[in-house]
Amino acid sequence: MAQLQSDNQQLKQQLDWFKQQLFGQKSEKRLSADTSHPSLFDAPKPVEDSIPKETITYQRRQSKQRADECVTEQGLRFDEQVPVEIIEIPAPELQGEEAEHYEIIDHKITRRLAQRPGSYVVLEYRRPVVKHKATQTLSTSPAPTAVFDNGMADVSVLAGMLIDKFVYHIPLYRQHQRLQQAGITLSRATLTHWTQRAINLLKPIADSQLQQVLQSKVLAMDETPIKAGRKQKGKMKSTWFWPIYGENDEVVFTWSSSRGTAHVEQQLKGFKGTLLTDGYAAYDRFVKNKPEVILAQCWAHTRRYFFKSLKVETQAAEEAMQWIGELYKNEETIQKKQMTGQKKLNYRSKHSKPIVDGFFKWCYEQRQRIDLENSNPLSKALTYVENHKDQLCVYLSDPDVAIDTNHLERTLRVIPMGRKNWLFCWNEVGAEQVATIQTLLTTCKLQNVNPYNYLVDVLQRINLHPAREVAELTPRCWKDKFEANSLLSDLARLGKSDH
């Protein structure tokens, strides 16, 4: 009977979880504290001043603050790369019989944001065929170099396709429809071929970035699923992206057909430092017998276990999340005051370590409860903490280790966002190519590099650049070395010459 009740309780918890995923709030943020359970860290109430205070009975409207770059009264902001088309509005006074009595002394400017439909341009290179009058010899200038030999695609359209597919998540079949509507006839297979060839050109850059990232003292690593290739008719294989985040704000997406430890061993071969992860067992197996690697644990994943137990053990789960919440308040203070190095370490030791010690003591006391069954979500959360105490404390002794892997999880969002549009990869090669291009585009975002300008440059530069110096083409290095004088497409050069 007890077993039946336990099974029934677990099924109810699973049903509640599915309802939450479908209809409920997915964020772990607590919108408001439950007033029936006072905070563990309530500050003392301030002593009321005995001096009588004046009561203000009117309200003063606060003036609206505008950003420095605000150029119009509506708040429209743009930089110098945005084209501006000027439309002259004639003054009626200058059109009539008395026009000679008026003169223009100034202009009032009104600006409105407008949009042209997505457009494509065919570049026609006209090369004269020259004949020598005496010898009758014919000659002509060579065609400009293209990204692909004898290719029909300008670098601008290749970069645009990659940006549309992997930044804005527009599948190629929709891009193909847009081409047709613009009057361009190309097969979808051609677009796929162009995409694959362009990514293959970029692969050495992504590989070089992985080697740079592995030089970091602290790495963050996670995994996320992707369907790639057919397991059987009507069913796709489950494969995995394993992103690795380095200390210089660079991320590398690696891919594996499995979620086993072997991939971690392969990708992190030779790494020495601290590895920040969630509680997945593959990472524990990886660091076993590796004294040169320290495993650190993510506090956000720890909090998630208690969040899942809220409906079953509301009061205890709330208390646990209050403990962890105080750690995050300390991290906010560190960030606001821009603490680094020893100052950051001292602050964590003084303010966060006592909270961690108190939290572990609280967890121990909760585990002594005789009414807490092993199947209870709170029991699982407490066991999780007990099994990872050492890893959860690593960030207290190393200022370069973050409290969680949220910075990595934010970069991961491009994968589920892409899945909602292109659903899966047809084959495993396609999954590897997604990993390659997302490595570069996501790092562009982290480095505040315009991804379109970056791709236009490196797709032209990669075949001319020395292979031994390919690391210079990674987004972080490219920003310092080439961004100021990046290569343009022929279309962009035409646009500049017209102005």
Predicted regions and their residues:
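Active-site-adjacent "gating/activation" loops or surface patches in catalytic cores
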Residues: 119-173, 242-251, 415
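Mobile genetic element proteins and their domesticated derivatives, centered on retroelements
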Residues: 24, 93-95, 132, 161, ...
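Gly/Pro-rich turn-and-neighbor structural signature
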Residues: 75, 83-98, 173-266, 270, ...
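Conserved catalytic alpha/beta cores of large enzymes that bind or transform nucleotide phosphates
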Residues: 157, 162-164, 176, 304-344
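Short helix/loop capping segments that flank catalytic or ligand/cofactor-binding pockets
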Residues: 103-105, 140-142, 228-230, 252-254, ...
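Short, flexible loop/hinge motifs at secondary-structure junctions
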Residues: 1-152, 191-192, 220-221, 227, ...
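Conserved beta-strand -> loop -> alpha-helix junction used to position metal-binding or nucleic-acid-contacting
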Residues: 218, 274, 287-322
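Acidic/histidine-rich catalytic cores and adjacent linkers
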Residues: 280-282, 319-499
